Regions:
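Active-site-adjacent C-terminal substructures of enzyme catalytic domains
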Residues: 121-253
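Acidic (Asp/Glu)-rich catalytic clusters
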Residues: 2, 31-35, 75-81, 126-128
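Divalent metal-dependent hydrolysis catalytic cores, especially in the metallo-beta-lactamase
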Residues: 1-23, 38-51, 80-92, 108-110, ...
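Charged helix-capping and loop-helix junction motifs
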Residues: 23-27, 69, 146-151
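N-terminal active-site wall of soluble small-molecule enzyme domains
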Residues: 72-75, 93-102
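Surface-exposed amphipathic alpha-helices with a cationic face
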Residues: 28-31, 100-107, 181
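Conserved phosphate-binding/catalytic loop of the ribokinase/pfkB sugar-kinase fold
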Residues: 51-76
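Short beta->alpha connector loops
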Residues: 90-95, 114-118, 168-171
Length: 254
């Protein structure tokens, strides 16, 4: 493709259960129709079993305690069960162990996100198949030298993948990302994108939520922050980006 991605996981949020089911049915329909363009590999359930303390932009009233009955209901909504590929969960919340066991038994990948989990809680729950971290450092308990927290666990466990969303330096500083990259390496870091705005546009794009303007500047992209700060991104050195992109494709296809 000229822009965007070759494949993706359709992602739900912490929404009312019926809205999540509507998204699942839509994913089934897209999978059956197999339209031209990027391939739908499956669905990522980013909630509803997340911690409201770290809800981020999710709906607090829809952040539910992990409930295996609700999980079974969501899973059974899928006509094509193979589309239920990935779930983000707060493993410290009561009931998470049963949901994680269910996911493990049904080959559903799980990741820590929107979570206040301690290092020890994640260490314990790894036995239930936790494989990574969703938008690492954002929406999770931070690092302390006496209690590593969720962020520290993300760096510590070599076999767990750290996903970073839209790494522009806005939600995670460049230095924090570089620190993670030094520790984890390209094979254990993945980048995801919502690919909005700038793709194939000939003019600037205003991201009103992030308060930033994306402007094409020759072969580069200029990020003009509303506070006056400017940054330039040179996409020509694609090899380093390709390494982390492919690690994501491989992770969801395993």
């Amino acid at each position: 493709p000229f822009a965007g991605v070759t494949s993706y996981l359709g992602t739900t949020g912490a929404d009312p259960i019926e809205e999540i089911k509507t998204c699942i049915r839509a994913a089934d329909q897209v999978s059956e129709e197999d339209p031209e363009g990027a391939q739908l590999l499956g669905v990522h359930l980013e909630g509803p079993f997340i911690n409201p303390v770290y809800k981020g932009m999710q709906k607090e009233e829809c952040c539910l305690l992990p409930d295996v009955t609700v999980m079974e209901d969501l899973y059974n909504t899928f006509k094509n069960k193979k589309l239920c590929r990935h779930m983000t969960i707060a493993p410290e919340r009561p009931g998470a162990d049963a949901v994680l066991r269910f996911c493990q038994e049904h080959q559903i990948q799980t990741a820590v996100g929107h979570s206040a989990a301690t290092f020890e809680e994640i260490k314990k729950m790894r036995a239930y198949g936790l494989g990574g971290f969703t938008h690492t450092f954002s929406g999770m308990k931070g690092f302390h030298h006496r209690e590593l927290g969720t962020a520290g666990a993300a760096l510590y466990f070599d076999d767990m993948i750290c996903e970073f969303a839209k790494q522009t330096g806005m939600t995670v500083s460049h230095e924090a990302f570089e620190l993670a990259y030094r520790i984890k390496g390209s094979s254990r870091i993945v980048l995801t994108t919502d690919c909005c705005g700038l793709a194939q546009t000939q003019s600037c794009f205003d991201h009103y939520v992030r308060k930033i303007r994306f402007v094409k500047d020759g072969d580069q992209v200029c990020l003009e922050h509303y506070d006056g700060k400017k940054e330039w991104i040179d996409p020509r050195d694609y090899q380093a980006v390709k390494q982390v992109e492919m690690s994501y494709a491989q992770s969801v296809n395993n």
